Amino acid sequence: MTQMVKNELAKKVLIPLLVLSLLAAMVGVLTRTDFVRAEEAPQLPKFDIPALSSEHKTSSLPNVIVVATGGTLAGKARDDDPTNFQNYAAGTYLMSDLVAQLPKKDKIADVSTFQFGNKGSGGYTIKELYDLSLAVDAALEIYDSAVVTTGTDTMEEISYFLDLTVRSEKPVVVTGAMRPWDVIGTDGPANLYQAIKVAGSGKTKWFGTVVMLNDVIYAAREVTKTNAHRNDTFDAPMFGALGYVDDPAVRIYRAPARATKAGTPAWASPFDLKTISKDSLPIVEIVYAYQEAGGGSIRGLVEDGAKGIVTAGTGAGGISSKQSAARSAAIKDKGVVFVSTTRTGSGSIYDSGSGNVIGGDNLNAAHARMMLLLSLAFTNDVNTIRGWFTTFGTQDVEISVDENTVLSTSVEEPVVTEPVITEPTPEAVLPTATVPPTEPAVTEPTPEATAVTP
C-alpha cells in the first residue's frame, strides 16, 4: 500500500471519528448542563386530585374537597369496644367512607375527598407537610374550598404551616376529633360536618387557614391545644374565637389581621414552596427554660445541625445564665438564629431590633418554630427574617384609608315626597262685603184672611 493511499484512508476514517468524538463531547456538556439545571429546579410532587363531577359542575351548591391525613377522627376503637375512648388506632378509616356516612351533607355542599395520608398528626415530617401544602393548593385550583382533617396532637403546628404556605385565598378549614369515629359520643362526625359547612360558606376567604372544632372557629396562628382529653381542648389565649357555627348559620365576629390586606400583594405569604426544594427545609428546634436550666440542650442541638432555635422562656422570655451563654456561643460560632417566646401560654415578646435573637411577639413556641423554619428555608439574612416576624408574623392591625376614598352607606334611604299644596293667587281673591245679618221674614196675616169663629 502506497503512502498516498494510506493518507487517503486515514482522512476517510480518522476525520469522521474526530467529528463524532467532538459531537459526543458537546452532547455530554449539554447533558450535564441540563442535569444541573434540572437539579436546581425543585422537583414538585404531583397529586391525583379528583376532578369535579359533571353533576357538581352544574350544581348551585359550593364544592368542597376534604383532604384527609388521618388522626383520631379516622380512628377505630380497639376490640370493637364503642366505650374505648383512649385505646384506639388513629388513621384507620378512609375519608370517602366517613363522608358517605354524614347525613344531609348534600344540603350544604357538594363534597369530594382526597386521601393524602392516614396516620397520627405527630407522625408527619416537615417534608410531608411541604407536600400537604402543595396538595391543598392543587385542590383549590379545582374546588371552592378545602377541609383538612388531621390529628389534634400537632394540629396547631400543621394548621399554621398551611397558613404560612398555602397560596390560594380560598377557605382552608382544619378539623379533627378528640374521640375516635366509632365510639359513643364521638365528636368526629359533627366536627367534619360543621367544617364542611364553614368551608362551603365562603366566610373565611382571605382569612388564611382556620381551625374549627366543637363549633368554634379559630385563626391557625392563635389556636393551641389546652387539654389532653376534653372535647373543648382548643382555645386562642389573648384573642379568642373568630366565630361560631350556630345552626344553621356560620357566624364570624372578627377577622385576623391578614384579612385586612385582602386583594393586595401584602396578603400573600413570603413562603412560596414551589420555589424551593423540600430538602432545603432546615432543622429548627425548641428549648424550654426552667429553674437553673443547663446549656447542654442548646449545644447539643447546634451540634446536631440546628440552624434555628426557639426558646420558650420564663415570664417575658427569660432563660438561665447557662442557656444564655450557650446561645451566645451558638450565634458567634455557627450563626444560629434564635427566636424568644414565653412558656406562660400568652403574652408578647418584643423584638430588640438587632442581633440574632428575634422577639416572637405572641406566637407560642410551636408556632414560632414553624415561622423560623420557613424563614430560614428562604434566606439566611437575619434582618430579612426579623422583618417577616414583625410584619407577616404578627397580628398588629393597621387600617389606612386613602383620603380620596369616599365611604358610603349601603343602606338606601327612601325618597320622601312632600305633599303638593296649591295656594290661591292674590288676583283671584276678591274682597267680601260685610252684610249685616237679616232678620228672618215674618208673614203677618191680613184681617180679611183671618177666620173668625163665633
Over which residues does each language-model region extend?
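Short, acidic/small-residue loops that bind anionic groups at enzyme active sites
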Residues: 159-190, 194-200, 332-342
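ATP/NTP phosphate-donor binding region
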Residues: 39-137
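C-terminal non-catalytic interaction/assembly regions of soluble proteins
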Residues: 52-56, 316-414
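Accessory alpha-helical/coil subdomains and C-terminal extensions
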Residues: 61, 67, 77, 94-105, ...
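Internal gly/pro-rich beta-alpha loop/helix module
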Residues: 175-247
